[in-house]
From Swiss-Prot:
Domain of life: Eukaryota
Regulation: In normal conditions, the protein kinase activity is inhibited; inhibition is relieved by various stress conditions. Inhibited by heme: in presence of heme, forms a disulfide-linked inactive homodimer. Heme depletion relieves inhibition and stimulates kinase activity by autophosphorylation. Inhibited by the heme metabolites biliverdin and bilirubin. Induced by oxidative stress generated by arsenite treatment. Binding of nitric oxide (NO) to the heme iron in the N-terminal heme-binding domain activates the kinase activity, while binding of carbon monoxide (CO) suppresses kinase activity.
Domain Protein kinase: 167-581
GO MF terms, alphabetically ordered: ATP binding; eukaryotic translation initiation factor 2alpha kinase activity; heme binding; protein homodimerization activity; protein kinase activity; protein serine kinase activity
Name of the coding gene: Eif2ak1
Enzyme Commission number(s) from the entry: 2.7.11.1
Protein's UniProt name: Eukaryotic translation initiation factor 2-alpha kinase 1
Species annotation: Rattus norvegicus
Family matches, as Pfam families: HRI2_3H (PF22949), Pkinase (PF00069)
């Protein structure tokens, strides 16, 4: 008892509280209550059929159910009030009433879900028409009616999908921990973009709001060295389980299968780990991440790393948000589920199976028994950058073998590498200044855009990465689902020691990754084995002697950035103010680049003038 209050005082307080009229509690996500057990000793033997209490099915999609209820209210508002302005006001009043009654959560009535409500309203209208047709028909019919309804539902989803209506899917660019990135063409402006699709499964109210909030944070990242963000939206996708597959062949499926076939040949980059950002103010007390990393260092010294992001504990609900690699169910027109495999089977996503929740396994079993599911798909439209720093380094390494004189080979020139690294540090300084830690900086997540090869940091995930599980991480294949307080994320060769060890990390973890990238920029490698050996040796302070002699300043900062003590690593601001970028050679390099750009502009202007003079001569 706090405050030294008496028992009588507490009783009086309780009586006063009971007499007051309290608002009904919000029925957001009711906690499951175990079934009561009764004494069945006197029950006849023939009636003792069920020895165990019946397991009531769980409902992990309460958010989707509330969204459907809100859509019904909006639909009724439009039916009873033809005036659009008045119907909107009626809808808001109805929502406020239902919120006060505790039947709805306020966030489901927000504008962020307007596109989903439009999807629902169209589906409701279609179903009402179908029901009317059914009533007017002969009730004694075969089952072809339900098949007809199912095909109409799928066609309706295609009509209400913004992604299918506005974009043409051209190719798959790669995949990360939260979804796949596709190269698309906008049907209206004809421009090419990159769209990342993230499948949201079993979303709770709190986690949905986190996703929406953090998408807005990503939209606020405006910097020349950050991949441009255009827009984001949420759609419903209809996922059919394998036992209810619909034999529909679509062009988009064929295109996807071709690219997936090319992936094994190196045509599609398969990200080694999930890329994500976190807010710098997050502390271990607020996080409960779980990850299991498998580092294999075989005879060829090739190191592969698999990192799994896990759930941050939520006080409001046991269920959590799961962002899954979408596979073939990224659009409403793709009924065949590829990644929803039975427990114990592996998908094409590398990684150990983990679980932080005993109830998650039950949810999976329920998913396996369900005929159809409706999920939310988050689409993030970004600037298209097809050339990554990984590609540039690979090409540089190939050309360095052919170049005898380093000064004559622009792909190995230290000045070019310095320019790339400086722009990279400027981008990292910007995101750190915004309070964001990337956690997975590596050449595959860094892009070179345009003719001047401007550096763009990309492949940002969501700041709620610690409450997210990948599809392959739902359940541990070894049956070990005990959560641990570790946070091993990032790719092994570029991840800091504190990340791999699961201890606390901050922006200095990104600085370690920059140190490894700095070494790779200034040290060409002849083979993959040599690269893996050198980058692994950096962890123990070993830097190639040839690099130390050729680039002593860079070697010095590589040593500082890759030190085990994170506090002693220089920050991004300290790097920008260091001798790395303040030498006379770098100033001359910048001036030379500007002169070259001006010369190109002069040549282009001369060509345009000559064309104009020719046109005038023809007219005369």
């Amino acid at each position: 008892m706090l405050g030294g209050g008496s028992v009588d005082g507490e009783r009086d307080t309780d009586d006063d509280a009971a007499g007051a009229v309290a608002a009904p509690p919000a029925i957001d996500f009711p906690a499951e209550v175990s079934d009561p057990k009764y004494d069945e000793s006197d029950v006849p033997a023939e009636l003792q059929v069920f020895k165990e209490p019946l397991q009531q099915p769980t409902f992990p999609f309460l958010v989707a159910n509330q969204l459907l209820l809100v859509s019904l209210l909006e639909h009724l508002s439009h039916v009873h009030e033809p005036n659009p302005l008045h119907s909107k006001q009626v809808f808001k009043l109805l929502c406020q009433t239902f919120i006060k009654m505790g039947l709805l959560s306020s966030f489901t009535c927000s504008d962020e879900f307007s596109s989903l409500r439009l999807h629902h309203n169209r589906a409701i209208t279609h179903l009402m028409r179908s029901a009317k047709e059914r009533v007017r028909q002969d009730p004694c019919q075969d089952n072809s009616y339900m098949q007809k309804i199912r095909s109409r539902e799928i066609a309706l989803e295609a009509q209400t999908s913004r992604y299918l209506n506005e974009f043409e899917e051209l190719a798959i660019l790669g995949k990360g921990g939260y979804g796949r990135v596709y190269k698309v063409r906008n049907k209206l402006d004809g421009q090419h973009y990159a769209i990342k699709k993230i499948l949201i499964k079993s979303a709770t109210k709190t986690d949905c709001m986190k996703v929406l909030r953090e998408v807005k944070v990503l939209a606020g990242l405006q910097h020349p060295n950050i991949v441009g963000y255009h827009t984001a939206w949420i759609e419903h996708v209809h996922v059919l389980q394998p036992q209810d597959r619909v034999p529909i062949q679509l062009p988009s499926l064929e295109v996807l299968s071709e690219h997936e076939g090319d992936r094994n040949q190196g045509g599609v980059k398969d990200n080694e780990s999930s890329s994500s950002i976190i807010f710098a103010e997050l502390t271990p007390e607020k996080e409960n991440p779980l990850a299991e990393s498998d580092v294999k260092n075989e005879n060829n010294n090739l190191v592969s790393y698999r990192a799994n992001l896990v759930i941050r504990s939520s006080s409001e609900s046991e269920s959590s948000i799961e962002l899954q690699e979408d596979g073939l169910n990224e659009s409403p027109l793709r009924p065949v589920v590829k990644h929803q495999l039975p427990l114990g089977h592996s998908s094409d996503v590398e990684g150990n199976f983990t679980s932080t929740d005993e109830s998650s396994e039950d949810n999976l079993n329920l998913l396996g028994q369900t005929e159809a599911r409706y999920h939310l798909m988050l689409h993030i439209q970004m600037q298209l950058c097809e050339l990554s720093l990984w590609d540039w380094i690979a090409e540089r390494n190939n050309r360095s073998r052919e170049c005898v004189d380093e000064a004559a080979c622009p792909y190995v020139m230290a000045s070019v590498a310095t320019k790339i690294f400086q722009e990279l540090v400027e981008g990292v300084f910007y995101i750190h200044n915004m309070g964001i830690v990337h956690r997975d900086l590596k050449p595959r997540n860094i892009f070179l855009h345009g003719p001047d090869q401007q550096v763009k940091i990309g492949d940002f995930g969501l700041a709620c990465a610690d409450i997210i599980q990948k599809s392959a991480d739902w359940t541990n294949r070894n049956g070990k689902g005990t959560p641990t307080h570790t946070s091993r994320v990032g790719t092994c060769l570029y991840a800091s020691p504190e990340q791999l060890e699961g201890s606390e990390y901050d922006a200095k973890s990104d600085m370690y990754s920059l140190g490894v990238i700095l070494l790779e920029l200034f040290q060409p490698f002849g083979t993959e084995m040599e690269r893996a050996t050198v980058l692994t040796g950096v962890r123990t302070g070993r830097i190639p002697e040839s690099l130390s002699k050729r680039c002593p300043v860079q070697a010095k900062y590589i040593q500082l950035l890759t030190g085990r003590n994170a506090a002693q690593r220089p920050s991004a601001l300290q790097l920008l103010q260091s001798e790395l970028f303040q030498t006379t050679g770098n100033v001359n390099l910048t001036l030379q680049m500007k002169i070259m750009e001006q010369e190109k502009e002069i040549e282009e202007l001369k060509k345009q003038l000559s064309l104009l003079s020719q046109d005038k001569g023809l007219k005369r």
